[in-house]
Amino acid sequence: MAKKRLTGNNRTLSDDWEETLRQIRTQTAVDFTMTGEEKARKLRELEADPVAWAKFMFYRYAKYEFAGFQKKAIRRIIGHSDGNWYEVLSWARELAKSTIVMFIVLYLVIVKKNKRCVIMTSATNDGARKLLNQYRAQFEANERLKYFYGNLIGDKWTEDYFTLSTRVSFMAMGWGQSPRGVKMDEVRPDVLLMDDYDTDEECRNPEIVNNKWNWFEQALFFTRSISEALLTVWTGNVIAKDCCISRAGNKARELAAREKPIGNWDIINIRMVDINNPDPQADYQFGTSVWPEKNTEETIDEVLAQVSLASGQKECFNNPVVEGSYFKEIRWGECPPIGKLKYIVSYGDPAPSNTTGKKAKKNSFKANFLMGAIRGNAVCIYRISAACHQRRVRELVLLSAGLRKGKDAAEELHRE
């Protein structure tokens, strides 16, 4: 039978796929001079250390030395894989979150053999297929996997669904598709991977976010077996105040607080002051690269310099900022002498005090801010002073009057 001739886009995709396979074969060369005993010893040594195993088997992806937080994640997830575990990896761009998860999943299905039915989910079916193709390419072309584990290709081998000779299945699925009834033999899904599940456009619509979250928690999550362990892994940085990743992260924190923890939310920014305590502002100003072997300080500086602060915070520091809600861009600087400000505004919140009941003698808290503006090439607004005290309305009025008299009077009245 004659082969069907590929044309246009299909031919380009086929050529790209063949090039990917060629690169994997080239970069996973095998030392065929090892004796059977040496080969067995080498494999035992590698399998005893998941990090060493990943570095050896997938050199193309592991060409940089692993960072500490990556090693910790690998060992944490593998260490909890025999039970129910809910992991959320909110790592900034260029920190290899999807690649690390691939190493983990392949270790579990090949070495530990405790996972047999994997579902890869993304915002679209095309996206899920592209992510799953990275796994399929390894089974198809990785010479080291073939040398140590034999031919792992099973009887079904498509972009959407493939099986291994060891009776393990992988399925790609976009959100909204029906996952009901998915099984590998008698095994229900025991690994759920959500990668690039959020999109910027969808996160602007709360109804879509709700629908996507409900689809995961109801249709997808309950494809599992109640009696068997499930590994759930989300990968994605926080791109909106309300997105599925942030909801999953909050759920993981709830699970981490249980008497027997079964979850973890790992937030890693491109730079950090303290790897265990993410702080977007402090990390941006004072942090250092969390993966210096790959991302140097100089290259991070160059990348961040080419985009707005809001974009850098969102993509590299897990801090989505809605730019333009109040001020288009904020520049921090020292306030000039008050006499040079053309406009000064005193803004207070004169909330009335409670005059009845047990708390009648307790005045409510009053707030007052003194703001100034100066006009040059652009209008600059400064916070001159701010105060929040438990006072009566009359005292707030006097405070405001003092603020209008000048900075010295303002500082006197604001002093505790």
Question: Language model features by range: what are they?
Answer:
Residues 160-216:
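Conserved RecA-like ASCE ATPase "motif II neighborhood" in helicase/translocase motors
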Residues 121-178:
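Conserved nucleotide-state-sensing and coupling region of NTP-binding domains
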Residues 1-85:
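N-terminal accessory segments
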Residues 277-350, 354-357:
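ATPase catalytic-site recognition across NTP-hydrolyzing enzymes
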